[in-house]
Amino acid sequence: MFGYFYNSSFRRYATLMGDLFSNIQIKRQLESGDKFIRVPITYASKEHFMMKLNKWTSINSQEDVAKVETILPRINLHLVDFSYNAPFKTNILNQNLLQKGATSVVSQYNPSPIKMIYELSIFTRYEDDMFQIVEQILPYFQPHFNTTMYEQFGNDIPFKRDIKIVLMSAAIDEAIDGDNLSRRRIEWSLTFEVNGWMYPPVDDAEGLIRTTYTDFHANTRDLPDGEGVFESVDSEVVPRDIDPEDWDGTVKQTFTSNVNRPTPPEPPGPRT
């Protein structure tokens, strides 16, 4: 709309969700001992994943080609919906500042809150495999789970935020009926709500005030201790080159009379 920028926000949330469910395992009891199998996770739409299971090279295909069977269990993750998250709205005029150098400061306005809906589809051939997978997920969502991520990692203004993930619903689809040639497939779908943020572009901050000059235009004022009169009050942050987010509110003030303001090439600062 108003110039190119890209903060990879959607990609980061998809990576977060994929990483969250990437270490799920099932256990198979064999004569030689227990065998643990890590369940692979794929980011794709549910329809695309089902087409892959039933494609013309599948084990059930009648085509005269080499058959390749999709290995189960597998997990499929997909973003299905998103909307504006009004309860998390903040003041759109607030800015985050970061000093990049002695004279360079970048700023960014508050992000826009969004609510993303992810669907996690689990496909197995055996009921016990499904129980093992789901029981490694459900205990952590009561009904929400908080995790921490760096939003805009590697950008000018990185931000560490707690992300709330809520388990909304579950749907069970078990293909109990079928002919002798079809393979049994069990499918459970879990729906999650993720509270996220979309960030605006980062711009150079202009007009960052570190020194102020106040003149009373020939009207004199008494000093608080009664030691003299003044017509100008100057204030400056201490130290002058401090980062805005590190400033503790310390200010240096001077009271002067008949002293001109510094002009370039003189450096700015309180008059003495």
Curated annotation (Swiss-Prot):
Residues 262-272 have a biased composition (Pro residues). This is Tail completion protein gp15. It comes from the Viruses. GO terms for cellular component: virion component. The gene is 15. Coiled coil: none annotated. The lineage of its organism: Viruses, Duplodnaviria, Heunggongvirae, Uroviricota, Caudoviricetes. Its main location: virion. Keywords: Late protein, Virion.
